[in-house]
Amino acid sequence: RKGFTAFLGTMSGLFVTASLTFIFGDIFRIDGMSQPFAQSVIFSSAMRLDILKIFYAAIVIGASGAAMDIAMDMSATIEELKYHNPALNGKELIKSGFNVGRSVIGTMTTTLLLAYSGGFLTLLILFLERDMTLLQILNMKMITSEIIKIIIGSIGLVVVAPMTTYIGAIIYSLDDEKVRKINSNFQLKRIINMILK
């Protein structure tokens, strides 16, 4: 149950992240060329690459690790709550899960912010040394791309905790027979084998 709940919670967050990536990318007219080595890849490769889609994939992949971490934390929390107090109903599990989720989301979004901004610290120092205004810095495509990564990644993480809590509350409120039926119908291993063929 724990792994299944975490999987569904992670996928819901990544779906939101991917959707927002396309929306924000279109609004801000991002072309993907702000990525490190993007020009080198285009000019040195014989393949026809869509740099914009690679940029979108980088955003989703960048957020996926933290999303999995939050989803597993929330799933484990719901499991422990139900294990120690089997009388808890779905509503009580959701309330307790949300209380834990607030703490988890705060630290994870900060981690994501620091991970993205840490890589561009020397670049920001260079901008400040050249006496560039904040407006000039924000209008640079490279900076805009990083801001979009941070915003989209954070929104995706904020979605993961409540979605995992809702999913976990539903799954852990079901009796064992219903869970076995869901697992047999889902057949995750069969789906993965079909994809890998």
Residue ranges and their predicted role:
Residues 14, 18, 22, 26, ...:
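Transmembrane alpha-helical segments of multi-pass membrane transport proteins and ion-pumping complexes
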Residues 117, 123-197:
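Hydrophobic alpha-helical transmembrane segments of membrane transport and translocation systems
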Residues 69, 80-123:
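Helical hairpin unit composed of two closely spaced alpha helices linked by a short loop
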Residues 53-79:
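Oxyanion-binding "anion nests"
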Residues 35-45, 80-96, 153, 182:
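Juxtamembrane inter-helical linkers in multi-pass membrane proteins
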Residues 3, 52-55, 85-97, 135, ...:
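Juxtamembrane loop-helix boundary motifs flanking transmembrane segments in multi-pass membrane proteins
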Residues 1-42, 49-62:
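Transmembrane alpha-helical segments that form the functional core of multipass membrane systems
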Residues 9-14, 44-61, 107, 137, ...:
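Pore-lining and gate-forming transmembrane alpha-helices of multi-pass membrane transport proteins
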